[in-house]
A protein has these predicted regions:
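Boundary at the C-terminal end of the N-terminal hydrophobic targeting segment
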Residues: 18-20
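Small-aliphatic-rich amphipathic alpha-helix that forms the alpha element of a beta-alpha
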Residues: 59, 78, 106, 151-162, ...
Length: 251
């Protein structure tokens, strides 16, 4: 009987020792995630001072910017032109389902951080509160353009949403949609007296990581928009037309 009593005391002491050595819960790591910042954009202007033909004529690639920040109303107009307007046009068609209408997502990299555009609500959702443009520029072939632009717009596509039905043509169709969006944004920038250019030479994996692009999406194009410098690197169709090639043939 005495032996069982001693054994019981030993077990109780061992259990107390183990319980006392248990680490307290680390509540410092269990912090609440900061609420997402949602910015309501102003309604876009449906009437401008420049005709469509003038916008086409004035369209040029601006590769150097002043670095001046764009106004929120300007960003809202670019976002509308890039996605909300085209979504409204697609909704008139019965070819695509509701899920397939949202093939693209637009990410806006600005001085205030990184934002995702929500076309249905016409809002910007902040997904990162730091300026990523310098880091983003390192993943592209046009570092000065990215870093000096007032805003860099990343166009990302979800090819998987069409893969089950279009199979091999899903990538082509998504690329075409990205092209429509890019052209709309470029022309909208011209109509607001802003400079812009598209960038397609970049490291997709690095851009996706830096921009925290959602899984299943693939970055297709980057559009840099800003205020052009007086001596910006530009090229227009008229400039190309005025160029002449001279062949020197030895006699």
């Amino acid at each position: 009987m005495k032996r069982f009593t001693i054994l019981g005391i030993i077990l109780i002491c061992f259990a107390a020792l183990c319980f006392g050595q248990r680490r307290p819960r680390d509540t410092s790591r269990r912090t609440r995630s900061a609420p997402k910042k949602i910015i309501q954009l102003t309604e876009p202007k449906l009437m401008g001072t420049m005709s469509f033909e003038e916008a086409l004529s004035n369209r040029k690639n601006i590769r150097v910017f002043t670095g001046e920040t764009l106004q929120l109303s300007q960003i809202g107009q670019l976002a509308w032109a890039g996605q909300r307007a085209t979504m409204a046009q697609r909704e008139l068609s019965t070819i695509l389902s509701t899920e397939e209408l949202n093939l693209l997502e637009l990410y806006f990299a600005t001085e205030e951080g990184l934002f995702k555009y929500r076309p249905t609500e016409h809002t910007l959702e902040q997904i990162y509160d730091q300026d990523i443009r310098s880091e983003l520029s390192l993943a592209t072939s046009m570092q000065e353009t990215i870093s000096t632009a007032g805003c860099d717009i990343i166009v990302a596509g979800n090819i998987r949403r069409l893969a089950s039905r279009m199979r091999t043509r899903a990538r082509t169709y998504t690329a075409l949609e990205a092209g429509y969006t890019t052209q709309n944004i470029l022309l909208q920038a011209v109509s607001m007296d802003l400079g812009a250019t598209k960038i397609i030479d970049f490291n997709s994996k690095d851009v996706g990581r830096i921009c925290r692009i959602s899984r299943g999406l693939e970055p297709i194009c980057i559009i840099s928009v800003g205020y052009p410098t007086n001596q910006g690197d530009t090229e227009t169709r008229q400039d190309a037309k005025n160029k002449r090639a001279v062949f020197i043939v030895p006699s």
